[in-house]
Every structure is written in structure tokens, then in C-alpha cells.
Amino acid sequence: MPQIGLVSAVNLRVQGSSAYLWSSRSSSLGTESRDGCLQRNSLCFAGSESMGHKLKIRTPHATTRRLVKDLGPLKVVCIDYPRPELDNTVNYLEAAFLSSTFRASPRPTKPLEIVIAGAGLGGLSTAKYLADAGHKPILLEARDVLGGKVAAWKDDDGDWYETGLHIFFGAYPNIQNLFGELGINDRLQWKEHSMIFAMPSKPGEFSRFDFSEALPAPLNGILAILKNNEMLTWPEKVKFAIGLLPAMLGGQSYVEAQDGISVKDWMRKQGVPDRVTDEVFIAMSKALNFINPDELSMQCILIALNRFLQEKHGSKMAFLDGNPPERLCMPIVEHIESKGGQVRLNSRIKKIELNEDGSVKSFILSDGSAIEGDAFVFAAPVDIFKLLLPEDWKEIPYFQKLEKLVGVPVINVHIWFDRKLKNTYDHLLFSRSSLLSVYADMSVTCKEYYNPNQSMLELVFAPAEEWISRSDSEIIDATMKELATLFPDEISADQSKAKILKYHVVKTPRSVYKTVPGCEPCRPLQRSPIEGFYLAGDYTKQKYLASMEGAVLSGKLCAQAIVQDYELLVGRSQKKLSEASVV
């Protein structure tokens, strides 16, 4: 049964048996306050322009921008799909049980004050579940925006630009539980169960892998591969299937053993033709870790395939219905604060101050203030942690292993065009270009970004190592050349067709850790050898690697370790107080 907001017949395309009709300013996004900030359960930042640094770059064509937004409430049609049945899968139930242990744990007689550095998904998750267990997290974020790798900013036109193109899979059980626990399942816009790849040899054309709703996993995935005859030949499919047999039969132990070999080398070792790697796994490698298959560890691919093929809805994708800081991070913040926790922006860690015994005394902020607590968590990226690693810890093997973990550069590009592009889908698209990874027309896929007259393409530019230091204009020029192949009838590199109204280029020199062969043994457990000090983040040890799901799970595991260490941490605090009173 369709859910109806303000409805018109704009671009109505039926893509499935269930259609969701919505308005970009209907109740699904909240009501509009006097200051223009949409409000629903107070989940918005007022004056969101202050959430990040402006990267706005005008072009001569920008004078026609914002026409639609000035016409009043938009009447919008969006074809989304119902939330899939995820709640009874083994992984979802396992994640739900872990969440329940925090709510069910005995209320502490003395709640711990835990200082957490970094308000990305790892830090937010750690704080959320510690608050659920009755403790008082103090979450410190260096910047003026929440989200870490899912941060976003609003420009002077009211348009958002993001750190990355974020996709929520059915195979993300801890993320899906988190949305349910916060009561925001309706903020995920589920798309058709397909994977859509551009065809470089046929400019402007796409090839699809469509997953049947009638079949269980892994049959729906196998059928999707067998039905696609445009990317792989039958002999290639057979050789690929034979090559995958050891992974399918060997289970998790086999998957973990493939950490030391690259995707390309593994494929050749298994007798899989190079064309399979070129046709499928270049795109998949770039989407998973922003690097090519000659660098990526095969373990990463096998983990993804395992999740996608073992769960019926594992590879089904959803977009968040708006910007991540307001639509995802703020509900977590409000949950934390409702239980007595704190979240502080503009609180950059300058130094980890130690006690004489080598344990953490406080986090020193850039303004000179010291934040003390009963326990400390560093949930910022591994590259930042290594810069702040105390000298006394550098010879400890646990910390020495972190040298192998290095963030990978990535660039996120947003381009607003003067017209609606036709050669696109309401979905994530794999570009299969040499410079671009995945992209989406966010004016179609996302409620908050909807525009019936003008497209906004958000594109992941990867691998980005050779481009991260180049100018924004060079990156845009290179992107337009790639788009001319994807949209041959609508885009040309010289803008003689669709014209750029404006663009934003967001560079992240060190994003998720680069999952090259040999990284797995270097990933740290959340509980460090330093009593009272813990790590969280997608680079820490958890089974979902470098992803939003991995970050959320790392936070839960970190919170679990702290709850388990409650007696030890209380004892440390009492000893500290008694020593202070003697002095």
C-alpha cells in the first residue's frame, strides 16, 4: 500500500510492485520551523550552515540555480521499496542480542565517566551503547560537524555536500538494529534489488544483476549472475564458479586465510580469467575500498560476497533520506544526551596525557583544558591516533602493529547541472571507469536532495592517490570527461551540452584503512593492553572490515569491553581518589 504525501505525476516510473510516494517537505522529513529548519523530534541543527567548512565554487551558470526551491513546497514522486524482511536473519538476531545486553545489564552503582575522542559512527556507537548500559559518556569531536567519515556540510544555497556516497546494505545487521533502536527505520530509502553497471564498451548503456524476490539466498544471487550475459560469457561464469568453490566450502577459516593475497593474484591462482576481474572486480574493489584489485586483499572481497550471497536481502541497498549529520547522527546524539551523556563539538585532542604508570590521565584539548574520566576511548581514524600515540607506548607490540594500517585517499565530487539528466536510475550505479567508482543522481535517489528539473550527481573519485593533491578544477575536468562516456547524449567535457551550475569537491587524504594483503593481523582488539584505554573504529578487529557497519560494530564491541571491565575501572578510580586524598 503506497504511503502518500503531496503527490504529482512528475517522473512517475513504476519499478516494482510497491511504490512509496512522498513529498520532500511532507511529514516524512518533518515540519518546517520559523527559521527554516525542518523539525522532527528536534533532530535538526538550527543554523546548519555552521556545521562545516564551505567548499562552494561558483560557475558562470549558477545564476539560474535555486529556481525550484523558491517556488514553495515541492510535490515529489519517489519510487522506493518496502523495508526488506531482515529481522529474522541470524546476523540481525545476533546484533539485536548484543544490543539488548547493554539495556539488560545491571545498573551500575557508580556510573563510569568515559571520555571518547571522535564523533564518527564508531565513537557515536560506543557512546550510545555505554549510555544504554547506564554509564555517562563524554564524546569529544574535533570539528564542528558530526559523523566523521559520514560528515556533510550545507552551502549558502542550502544544498548539502558529503564526505562520501553512503549506502546502507541489508547485510549491515548492526546498522539496521541501530536504526530500529532509534525509531528511524523510515529514513532509509530502499531501492530495487539490483546491481547496475555501466558498459564502457557501449557508452550510455548499462548491465544489470537483478535478484529474484522469489528465491532464497544464495540461489537469488546465483540466478542474477547466470541471467546476465552482457558482462560475462558462460565459460567465464563456469570458471568463476569453480574458482569460488573453495571459499564456499571452506567457510570463515578459508576466508580469513586469504588476507595475504590480492584479488588479482587470487583470481589467477584459482584459474579465473582476467576478464572476470576486469569486468566485475575492478568496480567492486573500488566500491569496497577505493583501490584496484591488484592492491586489495582477497579477504575483503570474500567477506562481502559471503554477506551478500548468504542473506536473501544482503545486497539490497538503501539511501539515507537526507544528510547524515541530521538524519542519522543527531538521533544518536539525542539518545546519548537523554541518558545523561554529553557530546561536545570543536573539542580537538592535542595530547594524550599519561600517569606515571603509563595509563591515561586525561585528554588535553587544543584550548589547553584537560578532560579526565574513569576510562578513555580513541575513536578517531587510525592515522590521527598514530600522530598522538604517546612516546611511552610506541614499543608495545599492540601499538606497533598499527603502522601497517594506513588510510586510503578518496575524493567525493558533487556536480549540479542545469537540466535533468535522463540516462540514470533511482539507484547506485557502478561507473566502471578508470577514474570513478560509484555514483548516483541524488536529485532522484534522496528525498532531501530531490529536484525535478536539475540533476545533482554525487560521484566517488577513486583510486585518488594521484589526484588528491590536484586542484578542484582539474578533478572536475577529469570527471566531466568520464561523464561524457556515461552520458554521451547529455554531457560533453566542454559543457556544450549539460552545463555545470556549481560543484563541490571533498577530499579525504586518509579515509578508511587501506585493506591491502597482510593487514588483518595488525588490526587491534578494542581493549588495549593499557588498563582503562580502548580503541574504536572500523580499523579495529571486527568482521565487517572498513565500512559503516564495521564502525558501528566496533563501537558496540568497545562498549562491551568497558562494561565487562566495570569492576576493574571502578577499582582504578577509587585507588586514584585515595591516592589523591593522601597527597
Curated annotation (Swiss-Prot):
InterPro entries: Amino_oxidase (IPR002937), FAD/NAD-bd_sf (IPR036188), Phytoene_desaturase (IPR014102), Zeta_carotene_desat/Oxidored (IPR050464). The keyword Chloroplast applies. It is a peripheral membrane protein. FAD binds at residues 118-134, 141-142, 149, 166-167, 172, 349, 538, 548. Its EC number is 1.3.5.5. Pfam families: Amino_oxidase. Residues 1-111 form a transit peptide. Keywords: Carotenoid biosynthesis, Chloroplast, Chromoplast, FAD, Flavoprotein, Membrane, Oxidoreductase, Plastid, Transit peptide. Substrate binds at R307, A546. Pathway: Carotenoid biosynthesis; lycopene biosynthesis. It is found in: Plastid, Chloroplast; Plastid, Chromoplast; Membrane. It comes from the Eukaryota. GO terms for biological process: carotene biosynthetic process; carotenoid biosynthetic process. It catalyses: 2 a plastoquinone + 15-cis-phytoene = 9,9',15-tri-cis-zeta-carotene + 2 a plastoquinol. One of its GO terms (molecular function) is phytoene dehydrogenase activity. Its cofactor is FAD. One of its GO terms (cellular component) is membrane. Belongs to the carotenoid/retinoid oxidoreductase family. Homotetramer. This is 15-cis-phytoene desaturase, chloroplastic/chromoplastic. It comes from Solanum lycopersicum (Tomato). The gene is PDS.
